[in-house]
Regions:
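N-terminal signal peptide c-region/cleavage motif recognized by signal peptidases
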Residues: 23-24
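Ligand-binding "clamshell"
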Residues: 30, 131, 252-264
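Alpha-to-beta junction loops
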Residues: 32, 95, 111, 143-145, ...
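N-terminal lobe/hinge region of extracytoplasmic solute-binding protein
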Residues: 35-85, 113-116, 185
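Aromatic- and charge-enriched surface segment that lines or borders ligand/interaction sites
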Residues: 79-124, 146, 234
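Surface-exposed binding/hinge segments that line
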Residues: 128-172
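Gly/Pro-rich hinge or "lid" segments in bacterial periplasmic/extracellular proteins
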Residues: 161-215, 219-221
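Ligand-site clamp/hinge motif
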Residues: 207-253
Length: 264
């Protein structure tokens, strides 16, 4: 089994790590261990501007769309959408049969709850400006959502494809309030197990995941390892399956190790 170190620019490689672990492309089974260079400050995707933290939240959360490895927008919880001729009204057809980790249904009302939350200035969420072009959000029916913009904005779907535009369980938001930052409940491939602040954020395979056959691994652990040499050593000893970031001099050394794949 080859270990992987990602030394690509952070915006593309880190956000792919959770998906790579879930796909099992380098793991036959078991748990994926990801050694990362900093401690996430929250697990609320709407309240961080840190790419590392956003990457971790992708373990548990999904949005209507996402960027693939080539930075092209792909459908996730939205199956399709239409735009009015004036560019103001977006109507989305949502994916049926999707459940949150708490067993509640994903639907248009859930999307509205999340967008209304981030747009509410009283909540003071860090990603609010990403959604400030939205005038209103309407749940037309359980699987149809309508978003009206204040003015036409061509890259609007890109805003919804960003990992911060994740859909949190409304029931969990009601239960935890601001503490949702420590109790993530989404529709992603892994459900939250625990967060030991200096040790690891742990997720387990979500048996009710809508994408059949995924995830390919039983669990994932994000371990904050602040020292570069320690992350490199963890790859070599098998204590970690992925590591990010590492300096180029470390990458050059690891390229010579047969069981380690360096992606640049």
């Amino acid at each position: 089994m080859k270990k992987t170190i990602h030394s690509r620019r952070i915006a593309s490689s880190l956000l792919a790590l959770a998906a790579l672990a879930a796909s099992g492309s380098v793991l036959a089974a078991g748990n994926a261990i990801l050694a990362i260079g900093q401690q996430p400050e929250t697990l609320d995707p709407y309240n961080t501007n840190t790419t590392m933290t956003t990457a971790v939240t992708k373990t548990f959360y999904e949005g209507l769309f996402q960027f693939d490895k080539d930075l092209k927008v792909r459908n996730v919880l939205a199956e399709s959408y239409d735009v009015s001729k004036d560019g103001l009204v977006y109507t989305f057809k949502l994916r049926a049969g999707v459940k949150f980790h708490d067993g509640t249904e994903f639907n248009a009302a859930a999307v509205k709850t999340n967008l209304d939350r981030v747009m509410n200035p009283e909540n003071r969420l860090l990603r609010a400006t990403q959604f400030n072009r939205i005038a209103k959000v309407e749940a037309v029916n359980p699987l149809s959502l309508r978003i009206t913009l204040k003015e036409p904005f061509g890259p609007f779907i890109n805003s919804l494809a960003h990992a911060s535009a994740a859909i949190i369980s409304p029931a969990a938001l009601q239960k935890w309030g601001k503490d949702i930052a420590f109790h993530p409940v989404g529709t992603g491939p892994f459900e939250f197990v625990e967060w030991k602040q200096t040790e690891a954020i742990v997720g387990k395979k979500f048996d009710g995941y809508w994408k059949k056959g995924y995830p390919k691994v039983d669990g994932v652990s994000w371990k904050p390892v602040l020292e570069n040499n320690t992350r490199a050593a963890m790859l070599q000893t098998g204590e970690a399956d992925f590591a990010y970031p590492l300096p180029y001099e470390q990458a050059a050394i690891l390229k010579k190790v047969d069981k380690i794949e360096v992606v640049t």
